Amino acid sequence: MKLIIFTGLVLFAIVSLIEAQAENEKACLPQYQVCTDAPGNCCSNLVCDCYGRYKSGARIGRNCFCLQKGVIYKREN
């Protein structure tokens, strides 16, 4: 009887550890993916870079994308 209880507790502990590990290892967002709602989820070599959208001088929104760290993007005419 003690062996059955011990086995049950060990299995419960193993399942709990597996679930906790899976929750901590969320998939990161790859390059050029939208990160407006999740700025901390970009992969390690990327940063969530945000840009304001303007129309006639008034701000109408914000876009955020996972981009390479240290890279500067410029608008082309």
Swiss-Prot record:
What UniProt keywords apply to this chain's record, in alphabetical order?
A: Disulfide bond, Secreted, Signal, Toxin
Pfam families registered for this protein in UniProt: Toxin_35
Q: Which InterPro entries match?
A: Spider_toxin_CSTX_knottin
* Stated family: Belongs to the neurotoxin 19 (CSTX) family. 08 (U8-Lctx) subfamily.
One CC-aspect GO term: extracellular region
Give the signal peptide as a residue range, or say none if absent: 1-20
**The keyword Magnesium belongs to this UniProt entry's keyword annotation:** no
Principal localisation: secreted
The keyword Disulfide bond belongs to this UniProt entry's keyword annotation:
yes
GO molecular function term, any single one: toxin activity
Please give the organism.
Answer: Lycosa singoriensis
> Where is this gene product found?
Secreted
Name of the featured protein: U8-lycotoxin-Ls1b
